[in-house]
Regions:
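Membrane-embedded alpha-helical bundles that constitute the cytochrome b-like, heme-associated redox core
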Residues: 1-242
Length: 242
């Protein structure tokens, strides 16, 4: 059997992936404790520490995600949007070919993402972007942290209180009516953020299962490629360079 090795994931893509994994795991772990804080009897000071930790991990997560969005325009051939988003020239044919191969039990190898994988990656990236955006809003409404914290603090500060002195869980520093109005506007963002928490858990679980199943059935070094940047195939992949 002649094995051929192909370069696929550049260093920036690999760093993004594993930093994203670490951030998401940290956010899920801390976020779960925050959700259960009342049941666990966590005092307000403890909640502030938990939320602050969550936000700082979130900053790293968002910056990493923003860099990946930029890298989709300037990165390697398999990291670019034209190789990730589920449309473009030839995508429909590739998608139909993969479905046919699945029905027939055949393996169709790809150096980059498979047509079905491109849909999954796009959905996952969309969920991550929405979670990051809502998280930044909540960093401002809950802790008065950047990027929106100063504006929110100025809007809810009590008369005679400098906005820089507004603190979470300190009702004496805020105007009750302005604070209530802010919390009412915040409610849909909280619902979205919490719902996406469960959506992301489901998507991540499906992602891991799909990768494991593909590795077991067809090989392709999917996991190791995210360390080495290379995939190895016995047969020519469908998206090999000409």
């Amino acid at each position: 059997m002649n094995l051929q090795e192909y370069k696929v994931w550049d260093a920036s893509t690999r760093i993004f992936h594993w930093l994203n994994v670490l951030c998401v795991l940290g956010l899920i772990a801390v976020g779960t404790v925050i959700l259960k804080a009342d049941a666990l009897g966590v005092p307000n000071d403890g909640k502030v520490i938990l939320k602050t930790t969550h936000v700082w991990i979130g900053y790293v997560f968002v910056l990493n995600l923003l860099w990946r969005l930029v890298w989709g325009f300037i990165g390697g051939p398999y990291a670019r949007w034209r190789a990730i988003l589920p449309f473009g020239r030839g995508y429909g044919t590739q998608f139909a070919g993969e479905l046919s191969a699945i029905r027939e039990g055949r393996a169709v190898n790809y150096i980059g993402h498979t047509p079905l994988g491109r849909i999954a990656v796009t959905v996952l990236l969309g969920a991550l972007i929405l979670q990051g955006a809502t998280g930044l809003i909540l960093a401002g409404t809950d802790l008065y942290m950047p990027p929106f914290g100063k504006t929110i603090a100025a809007n809810v500060a009590a008369s005679g209180v400098d906005p820089s002195q507004v603190r979470p869980y300190a009702p004496e520093t805020v105007d009750p009516e302005a604070y209530k109005a802010m919390r009412d506007k915040r409610a849909p963002v909280v619902e979205t953020h919490e719902l996406r928490y469960f959506v992301l858990l489901g998507l991540i679980t499906l992602h891991i299962l799909a990768v494991a199943l593909t590795e077991l059935r067809h090989g392709g070094n999917i996991v190791s490629a995210m360390f080495s940047g290379r995939k190895t195939f016995a047969n020519p992949p469908a998206d090999r360079p000409n």
